[in-house]
Each structure stands twice: as C-alpha cells, then as structure tokens.
Regions:
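Acidic-and-aromatic substrate-binding clefts and catalytic sites of carbohydrate-active enzymes
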Residues: 46-48, 208-213, 237-243, 306-310, ...
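Radical SAM enzyme core and accessory elements
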Residues: 1-8, 14-15, 34-40, 53-56, ...
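Structural recognition of alpha->loop->beta junctions
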Residues: 97-116, 250-259, 316-330
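Flexible glycine/acidic-rich beta-alpha junction loops that bind and position SAM and/or redox cofactors
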Residues: 12-13, 95-97, 211, 269-274, ...
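Acidic, low-complexity intrinsically disordered segments
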Residues: 1-196
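Conserved beta-strand positions in the central sheet of alpha/beta enzyme cores
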Residues: 59, 106, 171, 201, ...
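Radical SAM [4Fe-4S] cluster-binding motif and immediate context
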Residues: 141-299, 315, 319
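Cofactor-binding loop segments of dinucleotide-utilizing enzymes, especially the Rossmann-like FAD-
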Residues: 8, 43, 89, 205, ...
C-alpha cells in the first residue's frame, strides 16, 4: 500500500517552514503499519506533481485559505480512482462540504482516528466520517523529520494544545478545546534533538501561559542542552507577571531568538471587540520592551479593517512599529468558519466571496462606517503592508535586533521578513488583477446572496 500525504498550496507562494502535519502524520502511519510506503508533498514547493501522482490513498490537510486548491487536488485524484481522506481545521468545521470532495473526512485530532482509517482502508470498508478525540499528549511519536524534501529549512515542534482564551477570531479553541494539554518535557526534547539542523520553530499557540510559568521555565531549561536556536509564538500577558523576567531569561538561555506576538488590533476598542484584551495584558507596549530588554526580538501580528476599526488604525500601525522598534505583519480581518467572529459577522458577510478569498488580503464583510468601503480597506491594507515590509524598513529593523542574538537573530530577522515581503508583493499583484471581479461580488452585499463556497 502506498500513501501520499498532501498539504495544498498556500495562497501567496512558498515558505521555508515545513508543514508539520506531513511528517507527523507520516510518523503516526509508520507506527500503525511500518509496511505502508509513504510520500509527502507540500504543494507550495511541488505544484506540478499531482497530474502524475500514483498512490492507493491520499490524505489532504485543509485550512480555510487552502480549501479550494485542496478540493481541486482531491477531485482530480478521485477522478483517477485514488481514494482521498481529508482532515484539518477546515474539514473538521465543515465536514459535509469536505465530504463532497473526499471518500472520508477526519473530524478533529488525528491520533485516535488515523489508525482506524488505515485499517478500514486496507479492509475495503472506508467510512464516510471519522471523529478524533481531544486526548492526552503523552504518547505522540516523533515526526519523521527529513522525509519531506524540496528545501523546507525549518521544522516545527509542538509542546501543547488547547487555549483558554476566547478570542472571537481564532479557530484554536473550537478545534483543540479550552483545556491546555501539555506534552512531557522529555518528549519535546527528544523531538528537538531529532530535527535536522540547528534551528527550529515552536509551533504552540502560546509558548508560555499565565499560571503555567514554572512549566515554561522547566521546558526552557531542558531545551538548553540541545544548543539549537528557535523562535515561537507567545502572548504578552505572562511577560509582566512576577516570574516573567526569570521565564524570559530561561527562554533566552535555551536558544530563543524571536517571539511572534498576536498584537491583534491597533486600537483598544478593537482588542475588546475581539475579546483579546486579556491575552495581551494591561500594558502591552511595556511587555514588548521587556522582551527586547531580555535579548528577544519581537514580531507583531495584527488585523486591520474589522467592524470596530477606523481609518486611523491603518495610519497608526506604522507609528507603533517605529515607536517599539519591531517588525509588524498585518492582515485584513478574516471571520473563519466555526469562530465566534463568523457568527457575529454573519449578517454582514459578502457571501459571494468563496474560501479562496479568506487569505487576509480581501475585505470580506460590510463596515458600519461609510468611509470604510471594501476598496478603501483593501487599498489602505496594501499601502500599510508594503510600507511595513519595505526593503529599507526590513534592513533597518535588522539593526534593531538585540545585539545578544548576533548573528543568528539578525539572519533570522531577514529570513522571517523577506519571504513575507515576497508573499505580500504576490498578494498585491493578485489583488490588482482580481479587483473588478471582487468588487462585483462585494457589491451584492451580505444579504440575499449565495452561501460562501
């Protein structure tokens, strides 16, 4: 039996980060049945292989921005007689939609469902739906690092799942649950040591949690022995906690160079509308400065154009970047299926816009301010983004990276920002080419139109 595991192409080009589901699902497969031949495909790196792909079973992992190309790949493979299983957050949220393009859909986490999928396929009794449980994380296999080729330089390690925060825009809590589930620290160290190369990404939704700072310190202390450099996603609330400085010192000693922070909104009103104010803490600018004081570079991710935002928020974004000396990466607000934000924005959605537009580069809903038309929101988004990612600004930021991280953190700053800059330029060209068609869809408004595809 031959299995192909596929990650559909990203909207705006290739990334040096290996999609973690590929090598991890390969490890789950190898543990269940070592006789299965496995091939991995990241479609962003190998877009032209699917016409001639030969396998018995294809597994495709879907996010909302990759759902449409993922469905196209699935439809083409099924037309050639290849059985297709789909999973991931998008398929789990909309299983009936996904089933129209697949022989089976895995809803939820893979660990408990995937062995049953493989056994049923080999027995010729593949079921239409499989439901994975939110189980404990004390027996996860080490991903088959290195099985995926084609120049993916960074691997991702996960140490936890779940999130207690109630940010309205986020899919993590609906998919992984509100309880924080932690992996054994020695298992995390084992996976880090197995990664090829000397740098990796911690892919957790949050690398440090309020109330679990001691666990973060223990993890960072254990990782110090790997002598590898890393970056990860972290919230701001724990930074100013009583143990925050000790935690940051341990993180820096463990090789941490950069933290990606969900700034979420430029305005306080926007933060509260997203229910994200608890996550960022009471003094987020001081928290960012504290991170930098500990030698950790900071990249902020935030959204523009929500129904709570104003035109001034676009202009203020560049000021925040200059004032804090950080890189900033905006997107337009996306009400993903299954989120609370989706429910809130349902009456205002431009429902003619299918999932291919859910990339963070299009206005997807009506705005209460007549001045915030879809075209204005998009134009100002690109104006702001291209300014924040201008080559001069990228280079200037590199010289603001804490000196204690030289040279790795400075090289990493370029490796982080240059692919994003390239992707934004691709997005800008796509946007210009599609403007007329998108305006027609947006003009139909949020009522009386077809449901999003």
């Amino acid at each position: 039996m031959k299995l192909c595991i596929i990650k559909p192409p990203l909207p705006f080009g290739w990334t040096p980060v290996a999609p973690p589901i590929l090598e991890y699902l390969a490890a789950l497969t190898r543990r269940e049945d070592p006789s299965i031949e496995i091939e991995l495909y990241s479609a962003s790196a190998t877009p032209d292989v699917f016409d001639d792909l030969q396998c018995d079973l294809a597994a495709i992992s879907l996010l909302t921005p990759t759902a449409v190309p993922g469905y196209r790949i699935a439809d083409a493979l099924r037309a050639r007689g290849i059985k297709v299983v789909v999973g991931g957050i998008h398929a789990s949220t909309l299983p009936e939609e996904a089933k129209a393009h697949a022989d089976a859909v895995v809803i939820g986490e893979a660990e408990s469902a995937w062995p049953e999928v493989l056994r049923d396929f080999k027995a010729g009794r593949l079921q239409p739906f499989y439901r994975g449980e939110q189980g404990e994380l004390d027996d996860l296999p080490t991903p088959l690092y290195g099985l995926l080729k084609h120049g993916h330089d960074f691997r991702i390690v996960n140490t936890s799942r779940g999130c207690p925060y109630r940010c309205t825009f986020c899919s993590v809590r609906p998919y992984f649950g509100s309880r924080i589930r932690l992996r054994p620290i020695d298992h995390v160290v084992r996976d880090v040591e197995a990664i090829p190369g000397n740098m990796y990404i911690n892919g957790d939704e949050n690398i440090w949690w309020l109330g679990k700072v001691d666990r973060a310190i223990d993890l960072f202390s254990a990782l110090r022995g790997s002598k590898k450099k890393w970056m990860g996603f972290g919230s701001l609330a724990p930074i100013l906690s009583p143990e925050g400085s000790r935690m940051l010192a341990a993180a820096r000693r463990s090789g941490m160079l950069t933290v990606w922070v969900g700034w979420e909104s430029i305005s306080e009103d926007g933060l509260q509308a997203y229910s994200a104010d608890r996550k960022v803490g009471e003094d987020r600018e001081r928290a960012v400065k504290t991170l930098k004081d500990h030698g950790i570079d900071v990249s902020l991710f935030f959204m523009l154009g929500s129904r709570a935002d104003s035109l001034e928020d676009y202009k203020r974004a560049v000021d925040v970047a200059d004032r804090l000396g950080v890189s900033m990466h905006p997107s337009l607000t996306v009400p993903y299926p299954g989120t609370e934000l989706r429910s809130q924005y349902e009456p205002y959605l431009f429902k003619e816009l299918g999932w291919e537009y859910y990339t963070g580069a299009y206005a997807l809903f009506d705005h209460p301010d007549p001045a915030m038309t879809p075209e204005v929101r998009e134009e100002m988004f690109y104006e702001t983004s291209l300014e924040l990612l201008s080559l001069g600004r990228v280079l200037r930021h590199m010289f603001k990276v804490p000196a204690s991280g030289f040279p790795h953190a400075h090289i990493l700053s370029l490796m982080n920002q240059l692919p994003v800059r390239k992707g934004m330029k691709i997005a800008f060209e796509k946007w210009k080419a599609s403007k007329a068609a998108v305006r027609q869809k947006q003009a139909l408004g949020g009522s009386g139109s077809l449901p999003a595809r």
